[in-house]
Amino acid sequence: MYGIEYTTILIFLISVILLNYILKSVTRIMDYIIYRSLLITVALFALTRAQNYGLNLPITGSMDTIYANSTREGIFLTSTLCLYYPTEASTQISDGEWKDSLSQMFLTKGWPTGSVYFKEYSSIVDFSVDPQLYCDYNLVLMKYDQNLELDMSELADLILNEWLCNPMDITLYYYQQSGESNKWISMGSSCTVKVCPLNTQTLGIGCRTTNVDSFEMVAENEKLAIVDVVDGINHKINLTTTTCTIRNCKKLGPRENVAVIQVGGSNVLDITADPTTNPQTERMMRVNWKRWWQVFYTIVDYINQIVQVMSKRSRSLNSAAFYYRV
């Protein structure tokens, strides 16, 4: 009798354990199915809703070529466009309502009133210290000046690319650049940068680390300086820290919601730092009109083609953004 009861209890316990194991197995299988389904759903959603960043098409100065549209239809209804121009333009036009007139012309191209913003800057040099590129699409007009070619090239390199930067403590540390994408960016009201390359014993190569006057000057009284030195060699750096800052930066890639339109000049400026590569002219364009009304009329005519070789981004850019990826 007791044997039967013990057997019954044992069978009952085994059944409970077996049932518990089956339930846990079913739960694990269901969890796997549910999580896998969620993962597939999220992946498909991300792919179907992903931002189209378009194509990096080279623009060699001519704006009469049709490019494949890399933006969504109706994008102008929800996008903003910023047009940056020098003070010279508004002075020459000398019309208090010229912006309203251009806004009406942009309206005929599909850009609603209020979606186009006009931003004035005093000079290329001043603009390079504090550019504020907040719109979905940003067009920067730069009047060609032979005496400012290098400033224009550096500014274009700065705003047409994204940079990830970190502060540099030049009083405590030596620094070296790791490759072509690694640069030191100096910004301020007046930047004079000197460097002293060091050998493996941390002795100066052609300079004395204790004598700043023996350092090699790579920038003098600049507001923006992108410094490139020999890769893989430590350098001691001297900088006018009271009027300037310097950051250790790595170029991450193109900032595709910015384009530069060069006004005048025989060729589009090449902003490539590497002399062995083809000129970098992505989103660099050129118009050759003498009068600013003609320049703006051309931009209105070709605005949609210009935007089609750009890509809308949600990240804004100001002077602090050169130090961080935003």
From Swiss-Prot:
| Signal sequence bounds | 1-50
Xref: InterPro entries: VP7, VP7_1, VP7_2
Annotated stretches, region: CNP motif: 165-167
Please name the GO terms that the record assigns under molecular function: metal ion binding
Please give the chief subcellular localization of this protein. virion
Q: Where is this region: GPR motif?
A: 253-255
- S-S bonds: 82-135, 165-249, 191-244, 196-207
Per UniProt, Ca(2+) 2 binds at 177, 228-229, 231, 301
> Which positions in this protein are listed as binding Ca(2+) 1?
95, 206, 214, 216
Name one cellular component (GO) term.
Answer: T=13 icosahedral viral capsid
- Give the misc comment: Some rotavirus strains are neuraminidase-sensitive and require sialic acid to attach to the cell surface. Some rotavirus strains are integrin-dependent. Some rotavirus strains depend on ganglioside for their entry into the host cell. Hsp70 also seems to be involved in the entry of some strains. In group A rotaviruses, VP7 defines the G serotype.
Per the record, the similarity remark reads: Belongs to the rotavirus VP7 family.
Q: What does this protein do?
A: Calcium-binding protein that interacts with rotavirus cell receptors once the initial attachment by VP4 has been achieved. Rotavirus attachment and entry into the host cell probably involves multiple sequential contacts between the outer capsid proteins VP4 and VP7, and the cell receptors. Following entry into the host cell, low intracellular or intravesicular Ca(2+) concentration probably causes the calcium-stabilized VP7 trimers to dissociate from the virion. This step is probably necessary for the membrane-disrupting entry step and the release of VP4, which is locked onto the virion by VP7.
The protein, known as: Outer capsid glycoprotein VP7
